[in-house]
Amino acid sequence: MKLNISYPINGTQKCVEIDDEHRVRVFYDKRIGQEVDGEAVGDEFKGYVFKIAGGNDKQGFPMKQGVLLPTRVKLLMAKGTSCYRPRRNGERKRKSVRGAIVGPDLAVLALVIVKKGDQEIEGVTNETVPKRLGPKRANNIRKFFGLTKEDDVRDYVIRREVTKGEKTYTKAPKIQRLVTPQRLQRKRQQKALKIKNAQAQREAAAEYAQLLAKRLAERKAEVRKRRASSLKAAE
């Protein structure tokens, strides 16, 4: 079985192949999300605590959280379900997935390091992979640099260098949820327009009610007139 060990703090991961079945038996009958002591896997993982994140069986079917079976099942899946990507709007499909309970039929098991041990794992804990892109949302940029609301976020956007041919230039992401005077003005304008439309609708409704009452009064008067003329004719 292969163990895909990842360390989110450093942004690294590594695939370790373990041929001895006795070493991976500690994972059997455990579910996705459960934590396992790394010492049972080997002395090189002493002190480590792993969390089971998922895996694939020998035929390549992925493990699905919530399916409490050690076998493969066919589920009707829709948009928003893990292990399925719809090709058309509203499309649903019955697909085979592997249950969330670990068994000997798995080819790869994904593990996340929850607690680091004494020894370093080569290529996982001793290396750091920097993030390619910085934060994009205004609040996240403030958190990242410890800024206050008075500071201008646009000065702190992380720019990246792009080389196109011989020309090198910097590129910055569009800041999302950035509050600017233009945005506040647009909000005020939208609010004023909403109030204006509501007022116009109220006035139109009142005018229509007035016209309807007038028409009803005219109709009633006409009916009374006809009735009076018919009574005169009968006499």
From Swiss-Prot:
PROSITE patterns tied to this protein: RIBOSOMAL_S6E
InterPro entries linked: Ribosomal_eS6 (IPR001377), Ribosomal_eS6-like (IPR014401), Ribosomal_eS6_CS (IPR018282)
PTM comment text: Phosphorylated.
Coiled coil: none
One GO MF term attached to the UniProt entry: structural constituent of ribosome
Pfam families: Ribosomal_S6e (PF01092)
Record-level GO cellular component terms: ribonucleoprotein complex; ribosome
Family as reported in the entry's similarity comment: Belongs to the eukaryotic ribosomal protein eS6 family.
Xref: PANTHER family: 40S RIBOSOMAL PROTEIN S6 (PTHR11502)
Name used for this protein in its record: Small ribosomal subunit protein eS6
Species assigned in the record: Kluyveromyces marxianus
Classification of source organism: Eukaryota, Fungi, Dikarya, Ascomycota, Saccharomycotina
